[in-house]
Amino acid sequence: MGGIMAPKDIMTNTHAKSILNSMNSLRKSNTLCDVTLRVEQKDFPAHRIVLAACSDYFCAMFTSELSEKGKPYVDIQGLTASTMEILLDFVYTETVHVTVENVQELLPAACLLQLKGVKQACCEFLESQLDPSNCLGIRDFAETHNCVDLMQAAEVFSQKHFPEVVQHEEFILLSQGEVEKLIKCDEIQVDSEEPVFEAVINWVKHAKKEREESLPNLLQYVRMPLLTPRYITDVIDAEPFIRCSLQCRDLVDEAKKFHLRPELRSQMQGPRTRARLGANEVLLVVGGFGSQQSPIDVVEKYDPKTQEWSFLPSITRKRRYVASVSLHDRIYVIGGYDGRSRLSSVECLDYTADEDGVWYSVAPMNVRRGLAGATTLGDMIYVSGGFDGSRRHTSMERYDPNIDQWSMLGDMQTAREGAGLVVASGVIYCLGGYDGLNILNSVEKYDPHTGHWTNVTPMATKRSGAGVALLNDHIYVVGGFDGTAHLSSVEAYNIRTDSWTTVTSMTTPRCYVGATVLRGRLYAIAGYDGNSLLSSIECYDPIIDSWEVVTSMGTQRCDAGVCVLREK
């Protein structure tokens, strides 16, 4: 070869792996092994240099003046033979097989032998398995073994899923101190203090004799002044544990005073009157009927923490009379009217795909629907009623995102467009609407276990195009049109007593209004007041039974889809 060739360092990608494979073959054939690890009377031949290179534990054992330094056999205590085999496989192959069955033995053993790679793999596996039923146990397990990242992940998970976590045995078996630590946390994500109070009562009831004296200490971390007066009088006052404790009664009286003496609230500020930080939730408003007198494709996002609006990518098809729900970090925009025909198509916003999200189409409904009601229950989306351009529907269908498929369910008793659909206590409620002849005040509910609809107590006012949302244990119905007037009135349905009450009216009449719950308050979004389209948004505080206008969108609209998304 002619010319001058400069020297060059060349590194192969397979050299280290090849050496590991060769050393593993030598181990399995007991060739050149210079130490035997003995665990539960089972011998594991190995190479000191390999063990020392992978583990600070073995490095210290074989390089210091410990008694094991020159011994051909080393007894390893505190782990099983099967676990030792998994760990040795990792040392020689870089691969570890972690399962639900072995992780509780594997992680402590990895900590003992200081195998950082195995410890990390176990922590990542446990984090992937976090669930409301096990997150508290995983948190304690992580703390015991100084797995800081896993402990923090489990703690955040328990805060994020607090209402579900407290339903499981791990919560009931916590010590008083552990319950205090959880419920005093600002970061637990609850729509109200109701699940916090109920969690404390259920924990005490599990072992009444031993725990009853702990109730006053725990109750001081429940932010009772932030509960509604109705809940305080109907639920808390009726609780025997509360009536029997003077200290508990004092805390209840403080909450009542907060409501009865608003002029004293500034003097009563403290940990119990401070709202929890809750989830980082944002409000999305999608499509609708805009100021150009036609359907629009504009999507706006409102962050209540910063009180700022921003635009997201537009939906692919302009729609009014549209329904919208959120499910598993995705927003679904369902049906509607594009100015020419009613739609069965459905678009989805994958909000986690990138900064602004990506819209794509999913399976269309079986029926074209504008002004349909939509809600979620479990992992499914339910859509009922609506108008297809020629008739109003009684039908309901359900979407399973796991298989991208819609299926028809039992029909409602009454055909409805412009009705509200909402879930409460595992039951779907459909409220009001228009049947083609009359505006309705009737309400029916669907039991997913039986597949049947039944009537419940009707609303006081006939309403079509009202906003509907669940807050605490009440279904709120806001605004709408009664056939002659655009409404500002609001009524609330108590799901426990099957009864309606009237609450304070909105500041503005709103028909074709969106309604949703954000950070423990009810929001009424945009709509039509009988003269003009609205961009304003008002917020209802159930604690003081009062509405206030909080912000305005950049776009005037009605008939829009509205939902809340929990940001990562």
Swiss-Prot record:
Q: Check the record and name the PROSITE patterns matching this protein.
A: BTB
Segments for region (Interaction with DVL3)? 405-568
Q: Which GO terms describe its biological process?
A: COPII vesicle coating; endoplasmic reticulum to Golgi vesicle-mediated transport; neural crest cell development; neural crest formation; proteasome-mediated ubiquitin-dependent protein catabolic process; protein monoubiquitination; Wnt signaling pathway
Tissues expressed in: Ubiquitously expressed. Highly expressed in testis and at lower levels in the submandibular salivary gland.
Chief localization: cytoplasm
Pathway involvement of the protein, from the record: Protein modification; protein ubiquitination
**Record flagged with keyword Ribosomal protein:** no
UniProt-listed InterPro entries: BACK (IPR011705), BTB-kelch_protein (IPR017096), BTB/POZ_dom (IPR000210), Kelch-typ_b-propeller (IPR015915), Kelch_1 (IPR006652), SKP1/BTB/POZ_sf (IPR011333)
Q: Where in the cell is it found?
A: Cytoplasmic vesicle, COPII-coated vesicle
Q: Which Pfam families match?
A: BACK (PF07707), BTB (PF00651), Kelch_1 (PF01344), Kelch_KLHDC2_KLHL20_DRC7 (PF24681)
| Positions of Kelch repeats | 282-329, 331-379, 380-426, 427-473, 475-520, 522-567
Span of domain BTB: 33-100
Domain BACK: residue ranges: 135-236
Q: Which SMART domains match?
A: BACK (SM00875), BTB (SM00225), Kelch (SM00612)
PTM summary from the entry reads: Ubiquitinated by the SCF(FBXL17) complex, leading to its degradation by the proteasome: ubiquitination by the SCF(FBXL17) complex takes place when aberrant BTB domain dimers are formed.
Keyword Lyase in record: no
Q: What is the effect of changing residue 60 to E/K?
A: Abolished ubiquitination by the SCF(FBXL17) complex
The record's keywords, sorted A to Z, are: Cytoplasmic vesicle, ER-Golgi transport, Kelch repeat, Repeat, Transport, Ubl conjugation, Ubl conjugation pathway, Wnt signaling pathway
Q: Which GO terms describe its molecular function?
A: identical protein binding; ubiquitin-like ligase-substrate adaptor activity
Q: Name one GO cellular component term.
A: Cul3-RING ubiquitin ligase complex
| Functional summary from the UniProt entry | Substrate-specific adapter of a BCR (BTB-CUL3-RBX1) E3 ubiquitin ligase complex that acts as a negative regulator of Wnt signaling pathway and ER-Golgi transport. The BCR(KLHL12) complex is involved in ER-Golgi transport by regulating the size of COPII coats, thereby playing a key role in collagen export, which is required for embryonic stem (ES) cells division: BCR(KLHL12) acts by mediating monoubiquitination of SEC31 (SEC31A or SEC31B).
- Record's subunit section: Component of the BCR(KLHL12) E3 ubiquitin ligase complex, at least composed of CUL3 and KLHL12 and RBX1. This complex interacts with DVL3 upon activation of the Wnt signaling pathway by WNT3A. Interacts with DRD4, KLHL2 and SEC31A. Interacts with PEF1 and PDCD6/ALG-2; interaction takes place in response to cytosolic calcium increase and leads to bridge together the BCR(KLHL12) complex and SEC31 (SEC31A or SEC31B).
Q: What is known of its domains?
A: The BTB domain is required for interaction with CUL3.
Protein name in UniProt:
Kelch-like protein 12
Species of the source: Homo sapiens
